Amino acid sequence: MQLHSLIASTALLITSALAATSSSSSIPSSCTISSHATATAQSDLDKYSRCDTLVGNLTIGGGLKTGALANVKEINGSLTIFNATNLTSFAADSLESITDSLNLQSLTILTSASFGSLQSVDSIKLITLPAISSFTSNIKSANNIYISDTSLQSVDGFSALKKVNVFNVNNNKKLTSIKSPVETVSDSLQFSFNGNQTKITFDDLVWANNISLTDVHSVSFANLQKINSSLGFINNSISSLNFTKLNTIGQTFSIVSNDYLKNLSFSNLSTIGGALVVANNTGLQKIGGLDNLTTIGGTLEVVGNFTSLNLDSLKSVKGGADVESKSSNFSCNALKALQKKGGIKGESFVCKNGASSTSVKLSSTSKSQSSQTTAKVSKSSSKAEEKKFTSGDIKAAASASSVSSSSASSSSSKSSKGNAAIMAPIGQTTPLVGLLTAIIMSIM
């Protein structure tokens, strides 16, 4: 009797184990979906809850009010939520990886999006989300990030991200702060037309290819050492720029129309590969903080009502110079001395203050003033005319050169044209929008 009981118990255990195995094997670890799979209701999303991995591209839209993608850990493809005008919240907190892109676009009443476990994605686009107040993720790896036309007050979903190709944040009018641990930016870091009190903090950033900041209130880049291409500050409410560890800018360095700017501190900056443009910063009376700058590979262009310009270590300007101040207290003596020693090359040298003007036609191949046989020097008592950059010029130029994934391939050709505009003979009239476009295009 005991033997029969033991045999029966063993048989029951084997049967249960086989049933469990059969049940487990019926749950697929990977589910292939069509390249254009769509979900318009929660029941459509529930079909994927038995899959660890989705292979394909999933688009969510329609009349969905709240949405959740449960249990899925990986998408080998893209996840797009588009034009779901009734959607108020979405969560995919098991999702860890998306091999292509995460796109949230044209979701007019979406208030929150939660991707709490998401660590890796190729690109993220948060575009036209006028009601969103919360975006959660644990992103550690992303190539491209675009955040545009949202109501986010802060960007907190990237606190673990260390490197990125493109980080573009624009037209988020409620934005007040961005703090990021990113260490390298291999393409471009751009912030434009966000809230006018936005504070930018990238204190771990060591190297970037391009940085462009517009309509920013304060910035902190405590450890930035090198800009491979260009750096631009245009139409900000910044009061000071402190980049004390920065030593090299590969192309253009522009500081334009920052009305509240009073102080510059670039004490370690020694080389600018392209143009240095400092124009129409009305509060910047004394231009200093460039004490160790020795070489400007392009044009030196400084325009405003400044009383002093301290470039005491400057040895070489390769693209000519145009320095114009409305103040009669500004002296051109230091720049004229540098030009006479052959330190300023290019097409022309112009230096004006409120009382006098000096203009020299240069030979771009000459090595010194003494070797020139056709140089003409003219002086007059006419007052310097200010080159004024308006907000309309700035926005028109910025609009013409805005970053988008579709225009990335053409940006290099536009940039080369922009550099040509910057390098035009300074003695000639340069259209303001053209100059600003050139500046902005060169830092994209």
Swiss-Prot record:
Q: Residue ranges under compositional bias (Low complexity)?
A: 359-381, 395-417
Expression triggers: Positively regulated by cell integrity signaling through MPK1 in response to cell wall perturbation. Induction is dependent on transcription factor RLM1.
- For whether the record's keyword set contains Repeat, the answer is no
Residues linked to a lipid group, GPI-anchor amidated asparagine type:
419
Annotated glycosylation sites: 57, 76, 83, 86, 196, 210, 228, 235, 242, 263, 268, 280, 292, 305, 329
Q: Which residues form the signal peptide?
A: 1-19
Does Metal-binding appear among the keywords? no
Q: Name one GO cellular component term.
A: extracellular region
Q: Pro-peptide positions?
A: 420-444
* Post-translational modification summary for this protein: Extensively N- and O-mannosylated.
Places the protein is found: Cell membrane; Secreted, Cell wall
Q: Where is this region: Disordered?
A: 359-418
Q: Which UniProt keywords apply?
A: Cell membrane, Cell wall, Glycoprotein, GPI-anchor, Lipoprotein, Membrane, Secreted, Signal
Q: What is its main location?
A: membrane
The family line of this record is:
Belongs to the SPS2 family.
UniProt function note: Has a partially redundant function to ECM33 in cell wall integrity. May be involved in a repair mechanism activated in response to cell wall damage.
Family matches, as PANTHER family: RECEPTOR PROTEIN-TYROSINE KINASE, SPORULATION-SPECIFIC PROTEIN-RELATED
What this protein is called in its record is Cell wall mannoprotein PST1
Instruction: List the source organism.
Output: Saccharomyces cerevisiae (strain YJM789)
| Gene from which the chain derives | PST1
